[in-house]
């Protein structure tokens, strides 16, 4: 089941509740997915090289790295959301918007019994809890910049205090706390000749909170 908590009215509402004893969905840690994909790649003829891309030549389909330059039949760019290399493809034509918010993410170990997926609508912004297993869940909190800036230097304690108050327990342990600014970015052109942009380089949208 999924519960929604509204801080303004101090109300908890049940959003989804299935009684069939079947899994509604599954969540996987990104780290585990990468490890599994890495093992699968080692069993194939796909060659993975760790290099730093310096530039691309669209006319010759050539990619220049810190070690060499080589031409390819197809070039797929997945370089995150801010790489200047994308300008070669889309000419910096994109739709942008600054949400003036940050996303805070972390993993939490706990001893809470039967905790499910929950979303809390707080004054700072929506916070979502997504369980990995019975003793661990992930947190995604979309928080307004004014609250983020005020608590940047003490982010770990700020987040732990907020979670402890929401979950009515201090017996939680936070790990892998990360944060990044939220923005909208939609590329108008996503391919040119034999080069295509995919992933965050193509579009970045608001995560809401999970």
Where in this protein do the model-derived segments appear?
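A general structural signal for well-ordered alpha-helical segments in protein cores
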Residues: 2, 33-34, 38, 101, ...
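Conserved N-terminal helical subregion
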Residues: 3-88, 97-101
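A structural signal for short hydrophobic beta-strand segments in well-ordered beta-sheet cores
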Residues: 4, 56, 129-131, 190
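A short, flexible beta-alpha/helix-coil linker loop
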Residues: 19-22, 110-111, 144-147, 202-204
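Residue-level recognition of conserved beta-strand positions in structured domain cores
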Residues: 65-67, 74, 131, 141, ...
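Conserved FAD-binding catalytic core of PHBH/FMO-like flavoproteins
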Residues: 81-170, 175-177
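FAD/FMN-dependent oxidoreductases across multiple families
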Residues: 150-210
């Amino acid at each position: 089941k999924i519960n929604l908590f509204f801080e303004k009215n101090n109300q908890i509402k049940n959003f989804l509740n299935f009684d069939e004893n079947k899994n509604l969905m599954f969540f996987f840690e990104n780290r585990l997915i990468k490890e599994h994909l890495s093992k699968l790649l080692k069993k194939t003829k796909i060659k993975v090289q760790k290099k730093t891309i310096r530039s691309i030549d669209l006319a010759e389909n050539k990619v220049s790295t810190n070690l060499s330059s080589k031409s390819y039949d197809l070039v797929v760019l997945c370089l995150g959301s801010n790489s200047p290399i994308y300008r070669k493809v889309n000419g910096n034509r994109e739709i942008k918007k600054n949400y003036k918010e940050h996303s805070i993410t972390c993993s939490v170990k706990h001893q809470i019994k039967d905790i499910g997926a929950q979303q809390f609508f707080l004054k700072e912004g929506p916070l979502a809890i997504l369980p990995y297993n019975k003793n661990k869940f992930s947190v995604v909190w979309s928080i307004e910049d004014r609250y983020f800036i005020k608590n940047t230097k003490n982010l770990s304690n700020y987040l732990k205090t907020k979670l402890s108050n929401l979950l009515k327990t201090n017996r939680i342990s936070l790990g892998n706390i990360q944060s990044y600014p939220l923005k909208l970015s939609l590329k108008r052109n996503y391919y040119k000749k034999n080069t295509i942009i995919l992933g965050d380089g193509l579009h970045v949208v608001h995560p809401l909170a999970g």
